[in-house]
Amino acid sequence: MSVLLRSGLGPLCAVARAAIPFIWRGKYFSSGNEPAENPVTPMLRHLMYKIKSTGPITVAEYMKEVLTNPAKGYYVYRDMLGEKGDFITSPEISQIFGELLGIWFISEWMATGKSTAFQLVELGPGRGTLVGDILRVFTQLGSVLKNCDISVHLVEVSQKLSEIQALTLTKEKVPLERNAGSPVYMKGVTKSGIPISWYRDLHDVPKGYSFYLAHEFFDVLPVHKFQKTPQGWREVFVDIDPQVSDKLRFVLAPSATPAEAFIQHDETRDHVEVCPDAGVIIEELSQRIALTGGAALVADYGHDGTKTDTFRGFCDHKLHDVLIAPGTADLTADVDFSYLRRMAQGKVASLGPIKQHTFLKNMGIDVRLKVLLDKSNEPSVRQQLLQGYDMLMNPKKMGERFNFFALLPHQRLQGGRYQRNARQSKPFASVVAGFSELAWQ
């Protein structure tokens, strides 16, 4: 959520609003359990004032306001994760998930020449559980990493979540003095003695040999939604319902909008979602990896350019009408991995997307589960491990709903030599762990 761009759309005038002829309803618009009345939340009041002042807003602007508004945003002050929150992520389900990702980063570090230093950068770290599990693996394999200087860099816009992350990962957080010229708003040392810093924007993270992690990050970036009509593509906007006070509705723009430029000329779907912010971040990651090496690993809900309407809300672990009580529920849209691949623009190689159950099986989740089960004599612990495994791997649960996607230097897949410095002159191994069934055989 670090690189958020405005759509460039000007306000629609009253005449244009009056000309919008139809209402659009997406398949996720209603959960079937919406309340009879729309609770008037502070965010709803804010949005209605904004729309009355400037006209209907894009879905992207709606998502941005609802999730990251500095005063009322869902992500800014809420702890929405875990059993008491609105959704649970893979790291909260099983420690094995983070452990295998830690192994993946070490595998890539070894395969690309064992640099004497690297940065671990996570975008949107949640409660810090995932990076904590990864760091535990780094500690357990300290003999392998003993000659490598590691630092952790977290990109987080939520003050509430950054405080939780600090409690999870450090002995004592050390806030910096508020300095407009400093890109770091908090820093400290992890429980294992690794320097850790917090940023609000990926651009502020120091460039260098880095491994980037984005787990359930891209799915909350604002999307523009478009519907194909007899007149061509028309963007979906959010407007005030003239028939019902304190209620929002979807409408279609009466004419083309600038964001239409993001749609592929040969697009065959009737409804598409595009995320310019995701493209900006992928471009940044690609440039960094091409220049200084490393890799990026993305794990998220998504598809490879096949799905249409995926915009939905979650509240208390249930689907929630995206226009009801804004600010009280998470908003998300599936990641279009084909778009991420295009935005890499050939600067780096890409792998995936592949299903989560395939990636984790290739990473050795079955072996790791057996080791943990053999070590545990507690029935409750064993049951928890098995339930976590089922949630991660079952195709009807997370196994096929989540995908893994990676960005790597071209040399990594070509078996060539890495030319950045002499310390990394060994040929790359062409097999990439997780993306090949041969990875651990």
Swiss-Prot record:
UniProt-listed InterPro entries: NDUFAF7, NDUFAF7_sf, SAM-dependent_MTases_sf
Pfam families given in the database record: Methyltransf_28
Question: Where's the transit peptide in this chain?
Answer: 1-46
The protein's UniProt keywords, in alphabetical order, are: Methyltransferase, Mitochondrion, Transferase, Transit peptide
Q: What class of enzyme is it?
A: transferase
What reaction does this catalyse? L-arginyl-[protein] + 2 S-adenosyl-L-methionine = N(omega),N(omega)'-dimethyl-L-arginyl-[protein] + 2 S-adenosyl-L-homocysteine + 2 H(+)
Which top-level group of life is the source organism from? Eukaryota
Q: Cellular location of this protein?
A: Mitochondrion
Q: What happens when you mutate residue 124 to V?
A: Loss of function
Q: Which GO terms describe its cellular component?
A: extracellular space; mitochondrial matrix; mitochondrion
Q: Which EC number(s) does the record attach to this protein? A: 2.1.1.320
| Record disease entry | Defects in NDUFAF7 may be a cause of susceptibility to pathologic myopia, a genetically heterogeneous disorder characterized by extreme, familial, early-onset vision loss and described as myopia accompanied by severe deformation of the eye besides excessive elongation of the eye.
Tell me, what does this protein do in biology? Answer: Arginine methyltransferase involved in the assembly or stability of mitochondrial NADH:ubiquinone oxidoreductase complex (complex I). Acts by mediating symmetric dimethylation of 'Arg-118' of NDUFS2 after it assembles into the complex I, stabilizing the early intermediate complex.
Q: How does it assemble?
A: Interacts with NDUFS2.
Instruction: Extract the PANTHER family matched here.
Output: PROTEIN ARGININE METHYLTRANSFERASE NDUFAF7, MITOCHONDRIAL
Q: What is this protein called?
A: Protein arginine methyltransferase NDUFAF7, mitochondrial
